[in-house]
């Protein structure tokens, strides 16, 4: 199993939600690879290199990704999926804008707003406005 984590950042530093996403990814078996797309992202790469448990970092440094347009990023991800079995992104405006597009391009179902990773194929998420939790198997 290989997991791809989409890094949310501001072209200078990694945003906090990404660290939560990496923690969730660490509950899955296999390698964790980070995808960092943006413009002039050397400081983001340096910060990412200090994170424990990361096997690889994919860097895409191009002005087209400087504004984090979901249409551009989703094409990048979908066209370079390789052997990844899981793709994770922070449950932020960034991730909620990006991941449905990636899911559609890959013709697969997205599982949104997970609160726990139980195993490689079981995820816990809240339903009914958070008054009930559901486990997808």
Q: Each PLM stretch: what is its role?
A:
Residues 1-135:
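N-terminal glycine-rich FAD/FM-binding segment characteristic of electron-transfer flavoproteins
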